Amino acid sequence: DAAGTKISEEKMISLDYGSNLSRFEIILKGTDTISAGLTLHENKGEIGINEKNGWLSYWEPHEDSELGLGIVVPENTMVGYEHYLTDRKDESNLFAHIQLNTESKVAYYAGFGWKKSGQFKSKKEWEAYLNKFSECLKNPLLLTIN
């Protein structure tokens, strides 16, 4: 119950081998948008927003390393974003507002990269990964077998 409106949700989460981002597939009844967010922990990092490619990111220090967090939303379904800041630890967020399709479904990708993994050395490299991931969603590999 959300302010008098009954909302129901079905969710399937999957992760392709070798990917840094999990796929979230959600069926919702009772609303036409959802918000998916990144926790900004201690607010010591840098946010990145690319509405054209449908992603939000946060690059932050983590212990003796750094982490990149990200959300990628398939083309034309991110209808906005919100940067919510507070002084309270782990309560600041960067939200992507996502439109459900006509079947009350939505899909988005979320995950992280760790500097110590050797995959990403900087915010720039992390955001290049998000751009490439977004481009792959826009241009999927198609196979024809005869």
Regions found by a protein language model. Name each.
Residues 1, 54-58, 96:
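Generic recognition of long tandem-repeat/solenoid scaffolds
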Residues 11, 22-29:
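Short, well-ordered beta-strand segments enriched in hydrophobic/aromatic residues
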Residues 17, 27-33, 99-105:
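A short, structured loop/turn motif at beta-sheet edges
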Residues 27-29, 39-41, 111-115:
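Solvent-exposed residues in well-ordered beta-strands and their adjoining turns
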Residues 35-86:
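Polysaccharide-binding surfaces and accessory modules of carbohydrate-active proteins
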